[in-house]
C-alpha cells in the first residue's frame, strides 16, 4: 500500500477532496488494497481513517490538526438521504486535570476548529458500507457567532471540570459542544479533579459537536 504524500497547499487538498465526491468507499479501499468491513460496529473509525489516508493527512492520533502545515482539520460526517448529520462529531480528548491557565484561545478544541474540511459520507445503516458514497466536501471556518457559541460552551464545561463536577456533566450540557465519555472500554481510567480539589480516577471524556450545530454548517452550504 503506497502512502499518499500530503498535499502541498490548500487548493491541492480541496482538489483531492472534490475528486472523491460521488465515489464509493469500496472504490477508495480497492485503490489502497484494503478490505471493507461488513459493518462499523468494531471499526467505528474506519471511514475516517480511509479518507485521511486518501487525502494524505499527517496527524494520525496526535493532538494537532490533520493538515497542520495547512491549518486544516479533517472531519468525516455520516449523513442521511436528506443531508442531515447522523451522529455527533468527535473533536478531541478533554483535559480533566492540570488545567490551570488553560484558556479557550490556547485550547485544543479552538486549535482544531479554526478551519475544518468536512467530508460528508452516506451513513444510513441500510446502505452496505462498501456501497456508501462520499459527498461534496465543505471547507468551513467558524464565523464570529459560531466561535462565540463554541467558546461559551467550552468555558462553561471547563469551569465545571475545574470545580470537580465532571461526573455531573451530561451530553445535554452545552448548546453546540458537549462532553461525553470517550473510551470504548468503560474500564479505561484517567485522572480528574475531585470536588475537594484532590485528584480522582474517572473515565476519559471527549468534546463532541452536537448534530444541531453540524446540521447548521451543512445547511449553510447545501441549503
Swiss-Prot record:
Pfam families the UniProt entry points to: MutH (PF02976)
Classification via InterPro entries: DNA_mismatch_repair_MutH, DNA_rep_MutH/RE_typeII_Sau3AI, DNA_rep_MutH/T2_RE_sf, Restrct_endonuc-II-like
The entry's keywords: Cytoplasm, DNA damage, DNA repair, Endonuclease, Hydrolase, Nuclease
Positions of disulphide bridges: none
General function of this protein: Sequence-specific endonuclease that cleaves unmethylated GATC sequences. It is involved in DNA mismatch repair.
UniProt keyword annotation of RNA-binding present: no
Localization per Swiss-Prot or TrEMBL: Cytoplasm
HAMAP family with a match to the protein in the record: MutH (MF_00759)
Gene Ontology MF: a single term: DNA binding
NCBIfam families, sorted: mutH_TIGR, PRK05070.1
GO terms classed as biological process: DNA modification; mismatch repair
Keyword Oxidoreductase found: no
GO cellular component terms given for this protein: cytoplasm
CDD domains given in the database record: MutH-like
The protein's name in its UniProt record: DNA mismatch repair protein MutH
Domain of life of the organism encoding this protein: Bacteria
Record-stated family: Belongs to the MutH family.
Amino acid at each position: 500500500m503506497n502512502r499518499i504524500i500530503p498535499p502541498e497547499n490548500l487548493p491541492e487538498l480541496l482538489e483531492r477532496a472534490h475528486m472523491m465526491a460521488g465515489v464509493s468507499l469500496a472504490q477508495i479501499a480497492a485503490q489502497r488494497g484494503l478490505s471493507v468491513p461488513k459493518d462499523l460496529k468494531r471499526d467505528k473509525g474506519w471511514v475516517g481513517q480511509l479518507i485521511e489516508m486518501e487525502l494524505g493527512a499527517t496527524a494520525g492520533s496526535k493532538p494537532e490538526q490533520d493538515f497542520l502545515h495547512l491549518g486544516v482539520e479533517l472531519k468525516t460526517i455520516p449523513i442521511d438521504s436528506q443531508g442531515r448529520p447522523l451522529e455527533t462529531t468527535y473533536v478531541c480528548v478533554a483535559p480533566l486535570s492540570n488545567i490551570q491557565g488553560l484558556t479557550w484561545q490556547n485550547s485544543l478544541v479552538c486549535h482544531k476548529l479554526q478551519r475544518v474540511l468536512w467530508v460528508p459520507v452516506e451513513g444510513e445503516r441500510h446502505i452496505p458500507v462498501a456501497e456508501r458514497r462520499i459527498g461534496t466536501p465543505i471547507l468551513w471556518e467558524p464565523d464570529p457567532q459560531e466561535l462565540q457559541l463554541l467558546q461559551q460552551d467550552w468555558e462553561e464545561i471547563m469551569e465545571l471540570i475545574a470545580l470537580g463536577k465532571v461526573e455531573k456533566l451530561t451530553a445535554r450540557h452545552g448548546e453546540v459542544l458537549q462532553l461525553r465519555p470517550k473510551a470504548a472500554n468503560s474500564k479505561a481510567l484517567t485522572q480528574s479533579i475531585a470536588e475537594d480539589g484532590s485528584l480522582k480516577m474517572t473515565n476519559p471524556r471527549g468534546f463532541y459537536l452536537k448534530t444541531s450545530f453540524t446540521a447548521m454548517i451543512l445547511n449553510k452550504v447545501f441549503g
